[in-house]
Structure formats: C-alpha cells, structure tokens
C-alpha cells in the first residue's frame, strides 16, 4: 500500500480536470518526473494504481509533492513539457542523449559567417545543409575540402592584425589582415549555398578554368591541385548522402518496441526515396500502459526534432489523437503507414528497434532485478524501502598509502559518476580511524552539495561491530544530519561474504542461494576492487615521485630549479646548504 502525506493527498484531490503539465517532486523538492496530460486529474491519479509495475512503484514511493501548470491545450503542454525536461533533467524522464543526431554542415548567423560541421540543429540561428549519415571522419575530409573551395574566416576575432595559421597556408581570404571586402566575403558565402542547393556545376567550372589557367602558365603543380579538387567534388556529389542537394521530399519513419518498462525507438530518414541515415535509442520508463507509452513517444519525437531537421512527412504508428498533436506541434504531415511499401518500411524500422531492445535487454533486466533485491533487503531490515545505498571500504599497501572508496547504488544500479575515492592522510592509524575519516568527509560533502549527492538510505561498511560503532559516533557529531540505516557486511575466515551485522551487534544470516546474497556479494567485491585499484595508483605515483617533494615547503617548481642546476639527487645531498640557497634564490 502506498502512503501519501497530507499535502500531497490534498493536491491530488484538488487536481484540475484541465490540460497541462505536472511535476512530481521528492521530499527535498527535486523534480523526479515531468509529464503532460489532456486531463491532469485523471493522469496523476493513474500513477497510484496498486497494480502498477515495479518501475512505476519506484517513482511513486519517492513522490512527496506535486506541482501543476494549467495550459490552454495539449500543444502548449507538449511544448512546456519539453522545456521543463530540458531544465530539470528529471531522473525518471526519457531524456535524449546528447550529440546523437545526424551531422550537418551549417553557415553561422554572424556578421562574418563561418562554415561549421556539427550535430546540433538550431534552424532559427544558422543555415543548415544536411543531414548526413556518413562517418564523422569522412565528413571531416569533405569539410576540409569545402574550406579550401570557400575560404571563409576560421581564426578568432582577437587574432586579427597579424597573419593567422590558415592565412599562411593560403586557406583563408585574409580577413585577419584586412585584405577581404564585405562584398567578396558574401560572394563566397553565396557560393557555399549555391553548391549545396543547386549542385556543383558552378564550382566544377571554376576549378576547370583554374586548372586550364595554371597549365597555360606551366604551373603544373597548381594544375594538379585543381584537378584533385575536381575529383574530390565529384566524389562528394556521388555519395548517397548528398541526395538532398536537389531533394524535393524528406520522409522519416519512426518505429518502437516496448516491453517490461523498456522502450526502444528507431528513426529512418529518407530523402527522395533514399535512406540517408538511422538513429536509435533505448530508455527505461516508469510508465507501463499503452496510452502512457504513446505519450512518452510523442515527447521523444518532439524533443528529437528540436535538435534534428524536421522532415516534410513523418510516418509512425500512433493513435489519431497523438498523430494530430504531433502534426499541429511540428507543423508537418504526420500519418499512419498508408500503403504496402510504407508498411514494409515501418516494419523494418520496428525490427531494428526490437533488435536494439534485445541487445540492451540484459543490462536493463539486471538493473530491474537488482531494484527488486533492494526491496527484499528493506524487508529483511524491517524498513519501508531502500532506494539508495552506499558501501564503503578501505584499502592500503602500507601505512603511508591508504585509500578509502565509496560506491553508490540507486534501485540496484551502480551510479559510476557518484563513486568517490578518498586519499587518507591522518596521524592515527588503524582501520576504524580510516573508516571514521572517510565517513566524516562524506558527511561534510553531503552538507555542502546536498542536492547533487545527498546521503543514501542505507550505508554499508565492510566489517563488523567495530566499524559500525565508529561510523555511528561520527554521525553523532552531526546532530542536524539524518543518520541513514547502518549495517556491516562481515566475511568469514575464507574472506567470503557471510552475514549482516546490525548496530546492536545482532547478526542476520543470508541464504547463500538467493539473489539478495548474490547482490551483496557483488557490491562488496566491486567496492573492494575499486578501493584496491585506487590504492595501487597511489602507490605507483609515489614510487615515481621525486623524494624532494616530501620535504615540507618544497614544490614542483623548486624541484625543477634544483634539477636544472644539480641534475641528480645525489648531488643535492652532497652540495653545501649555502649553494642550494644561492641557486634557489636566483
């Protein structure tokens, strides 16, 4: 049974029967999920259905508050939802991966435009040509060729007044030296537009004339250069990806497959009936029914075309209501597959989506199973839930090279970006003192950056009651900090994970044949490996470090001065102190 607080219950009861957006928040005020709805009341209450999937329950159990934004219609809601997701990047939302679109050539919208190659599509700011599905390295060669054909500014404005690197290579028009004119520059810009919009005939004619002129002057090296440029231009034109040069029709097909809270989406882009590229992504979703999955797909499509070129026609299998919503929002023709050929293409796209889902299925299912193990652990410890846990371990080769390690898991998934390593340099030696130092620094960091990395629900220490008591004492010195559940993960005489130790020194034996035992063993091995790896790195650095750096007040710059004058460490020790002072003072 899901329990909600009084504030949330009141807001749910008074949710509006109007279109708009809703923002689920946790008890710290962080946005967990942003959604849109034709009827906000019906949508938000749907989340609290007791028969929802585990992924949905994982979201609902974190909800402590909700915020509504009432709008005129679903189009406005779709637009605002996209902006809110971009602003908050909620952990439960489907968020597009950065730099995962097609490549475009584009002319920047500046006083002195430049030719660039990139993925981000911002039609209102720049003039784009594409998309291209060729490899980035091949397009980079073509880009270099275009820069030779159309030598627009490449150097930064602050470099003007003296010849830039490209000027010396004769690859720019001399903007840095003030040798160009606005008229000449705009003519070059129009040449690029002519090349992409109307084909290369004008460029080829120009290169042929340059070749003939160079040959007549018996400058055969230059003539060969212009001939090579002609061949490169023809190669560019013959590439499949340049079909857009005289294109009249652009048509995208989007197919998707959804199974057990995993959504795989594939996009095929066609120009004049030629496939120019494929893009696919796989996501985990908290939604688990058809309407909500369609809503998530509509959100994806709207986001996708905010950074990619919008086709004239989009074919996707959706309800008439969502087709109409996308058509009105994107201002294009959005349809179901109409004939046998379109149905065949869409089925191929769906097959690609299914393959993408199957490829990543194991990883998603493992995370899902791990999340369920978190609930089993919560039941074992007799607490409502454990959404996040952190595990700490200490590793050292000797008393001078000690490293603490912390790994964080949320719903069973390791959050690699939140892993922490602690170099320990304290006077009081011993495992419990090292543990105290790590926990103290972890609490301090949580206070300073609570929103980025708050303390977890559960803290696991590698060890028994001695380590637990040490950690408890550290938390006692921070009365305003909420102490997480603390347990120890003890090992047997064969150094294998064996049982759980609680704060009152009672133990809980774990069935060795359960997923819970396998999970705890895995995370204990992962933190042990992480700690040892970082301890080894610290020792390795120390071995190759100049011993002079161990002297208090001596830094790398001072050591370099001494090395320049004495060359070997032996000479440092044999020379007179006064001589060292003289050298250092120079």
UniProtKB/Swiss-Prot annotation:
Signal peptide bounds: none
Domain GIY-YIG: 17-94
Residue stretches making up the UVR domain: 201-236
Subcellular location: Cytoplasm
InterPro entries: GIY-YIG_endonuc, GIY-YIG_endonuc_sf, GIY-YIG_UvrC_Cho, UVR_dom, UvrABC_protein_C, UvrC, UvrC_RNase_H_dom, UvrC_RNase_H_dom_sf
Keywords: Cytoplasm, DNA damage, DNA excision, DNA repair, Excision nuclease, SOS response
GO biological-process terms attached to the record: nucleotide-excision repair; SOS response
Bridged cysteine pairs (disulfide): none
GO molecular function: DNA binding; excinuclease ABC activity
GO cellular component, one term: excinuclease repair complex
Gene3D superfamilies given in the database record: GIY-YIG endonuclease, UvrC, RNAse H endonuclease domain
One Pfam family recorded for the sequence: UvrC_RNaseH_dom
Source organism, top-level taxon: Bacteria
Subunit description: Interacts with UvrB in an incision complex.
Family as reported in the entry's similarity comment: Belongs to the UvrC family.
Known function: The UvrABC repair system catalyzes the recognition and processing of DNA lesions. UvrC both incises the 5' and 3' sides of the lesion. The N-terminal half is responsible for the 3' incision and the C-terminal half is responsible for the 5' incision.
Protein name as it appears in the record: UvrABC system protein C
Naturally occurring in which organism (per UniProt): Mycoplasma pneumoniae (strain ATCC 29342 / M129 / Subtype 1) (Mycoplasmoides pneumoniae)
Taxonomic path: Bacteria, Bacillati, Mycoplasmatota, Mycoplasmoidales, Mycoplasmoidaceae
């Amino acid at each position: 049974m899901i329990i909600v607080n009084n504030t949330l219950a009141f807001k749910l009861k008074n949710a509006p029967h109007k279109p708009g957006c809703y923002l689920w928040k946790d008890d710290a005020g962080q946005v967990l999920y942003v959604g849109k709805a034709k009827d906000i009341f019906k949508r938000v209450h749907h989340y609290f259905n007791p028969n929802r999937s585990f992924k949905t329950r994982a979201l609902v159990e974190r909800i402590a508050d909700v915020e509504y934004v009432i709008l005129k219609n679903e189009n406005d809601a779709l637009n605002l939802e996209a902006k809110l997701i971009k602003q908050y990047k909620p952990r439960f939302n489907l968020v597009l991966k950065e730099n995962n679109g097609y490549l475009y050539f584009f002319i920047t919208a500046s006083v002195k435009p430049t030719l660039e190659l990139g993925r981000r599509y911002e039609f209102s700011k720049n003039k784009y040509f594409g998309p291209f599905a060729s490899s980035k390295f091949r397009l980079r060669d073509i880009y270099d060729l275009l820069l030779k054909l159309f030598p627009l500014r490449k150097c930064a404005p602050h470099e003007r007044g003296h010849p830039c690197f490209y000027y010396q290579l004769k690859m720019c028009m001399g903007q840095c030296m003030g040798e160009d004119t606005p008229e000449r520059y705009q003519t070059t810009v129009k040449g690029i537009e002519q090349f992409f919009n109307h084909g290369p005939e004008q460029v080829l004619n120009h290169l042929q004339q340059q070749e003939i002129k160079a040959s007549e002057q018996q400058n055969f090296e230059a003539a060969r250069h212009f001939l090579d440029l002609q061949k490169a231009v023809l190669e560019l034109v013959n590439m499949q990806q340049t079909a857009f040069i005289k294109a009249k029709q652009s048509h995208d097909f989007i197919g998707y497959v959804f199974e057990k809270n995993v959504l795989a989406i594939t996009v095929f882009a066609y120009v004049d009936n030629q496939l120019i590229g494929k893009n696919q992504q796989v996501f985990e979703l908290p939604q688990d029914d058809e309407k909500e999955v369609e809503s998530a797909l509509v959100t994806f499509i709207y986001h996708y075309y905010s950074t990619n070129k919008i086709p004239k026609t989009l074919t996707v299998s959706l309800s008439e209501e969502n087709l109409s919503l996308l058509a009105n929002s994107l201002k294009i023709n959005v349809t179901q597959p109409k004939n046998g050929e379109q149905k065949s293409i869409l089925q191929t796209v769906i097959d690609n989506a299914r393959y993408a889902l199957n490829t990543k299925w194991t990883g998603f299912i493992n995370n899902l199973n791990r999340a369920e193990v978190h609930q089993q652990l919560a039941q074992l410890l007799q607490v409502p839930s454990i959404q996040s846990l952190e595990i700490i371990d200490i590793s050292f080769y000797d008393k001078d090279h000690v490293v603490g390690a912390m790994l964080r898991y949320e719903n069973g998934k390791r959050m690699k970006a939140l892993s922490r390593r602690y170099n320990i340099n304290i006077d009081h030696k011993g495992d419990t003192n090292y543990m105290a130092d790590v926990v103290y620094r972890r609490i301090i960091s949580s206070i300073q950056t609570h929103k980025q990395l708050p303390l977890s629900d559960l803290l696991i220490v590698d060890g028994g009651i001695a380590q637990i008591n040490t950690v408890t004492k550290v938390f006692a010195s921070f009365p305003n900090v909420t102490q997480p559940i603390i347990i120890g993960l003890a090992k047997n005489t064969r150094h294998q994970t064996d049982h759980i130790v609680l704060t009152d020194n009672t133990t809980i034996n774990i069935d060795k044949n359960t997923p819970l035992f396998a999970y705890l063993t895995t995370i204990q091995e992962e933190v042990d490996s992480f700690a040892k790896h970082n301890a080894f790195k610290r020792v390795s650095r120390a071995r190759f470090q100049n011993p002079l750096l161990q002297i208090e007040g001596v830094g790398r710059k001072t050591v370099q001065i001494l090395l320049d004058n004495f060359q070997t460490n032996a000479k440092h020790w044999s020379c007179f102190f006064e001589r060292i002072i003289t050298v250092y003072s120079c």
